[in-house]
From Swiss-Prot:
Lineage of producing organism: Eukaryota, Metazoa, Chordata, Craniata, Vertebrata
Protein name according to UniProt: Snaclec agkisacutacin subunit A
Function: Anticoagulant protein which binds to the gamma-carboxyglutamic acid-domain regions of factors IX (F9) and factor X (F10) in the presence of calcium with a 1 to 1 stoichiometry. Also inhibits platelet aggregation by binding to platelet glycoprotein Ibalpha (GP1BA) and functioning as a blocker of von Willebrand factor (VWF). Is devoid of hemorrhagic and lethal activities. Possesses antithrombotic and thrombolytic activities. Also hydrolyzes the Aalpha-chain of fibrinogen (FGA). Does not affect the Bbeta-chain (FGB) and the gamma chain (FGG).
Subunit structure: Heterodimer with subunit B of AaACP or agkisacutacin; disulfide-linked.
Major subcellular site: secreted
Entry's family note: Belongs to the snaclec family.
Length: 152
């Protein structure tokens, strides 16, 4: 009996330690490096997509891509979910006019520690493009309606 309790306790400890290794994501969301991600196929403007993400889950925003590993993960996630002819998908990067200076920042306020531009253009909102496997960033008109990726 004592051996059974010891083995059961050991299995419980292993289970609890493994369950804490990934983010606890809601159903339909995917986990990477402690964050949760979900691709939404419906088309929205950049502003509407950002607003939608904030309402999905506490702390939600359009995705902020902070490393090449995260870019690979997000690109693969989009490629798995978007099977239509849509060629752009919104990410959380947007040019903001502040005190007569234009700055680029993530919608969640995090700093830009990783960059992966396709080319420089004058449009204000950014997304990823199918021709680059959804890896490279490109400027698009903010009022354009496209699918998007939320992160929490």
């Amino acid at each position: 009996m004592g051996r059974f309790i010891f083995v059961s306790f050991g299995l419980l400890v292993v289970f609890l330690s493994l369950s804490g290794t990934a983010a606890d994501c809601s159903s339909g969301w995917s986990s990477y490096e402690g964050h949760c991600y979900k691709v939404f196929k419906q088309s929205k403007t950049w502003t509407d997509a950002e607003s939608f993400c904030t309402k999905q889950v506490n702390g939600g925003h359009l995705v902020s891509i902070e490393s090449s590993g995260e870019a690979d993960f997000v690109g693969q996630l989009i490629a798995q979910k978007i099977k239509s002819a849509k060629i752009h998908v919104w990410i959380g990067l947007r040019a903001q006019n502040k005190e007569k200076q234009c700055s680029i920042e993530w919608s969640d306020g995090s700093s830009i520690s990783y960059e992966n531009w396709i080319e420089e253009e004058s449009k204000k909102c950014l997304g990823v493009h199918i021709e680059t496997g959804f890896h490279k960033w490109e400027n698009f008109y903010c009022e354009q309606q496209d699918p998007f990726v939320c992160e929490a």
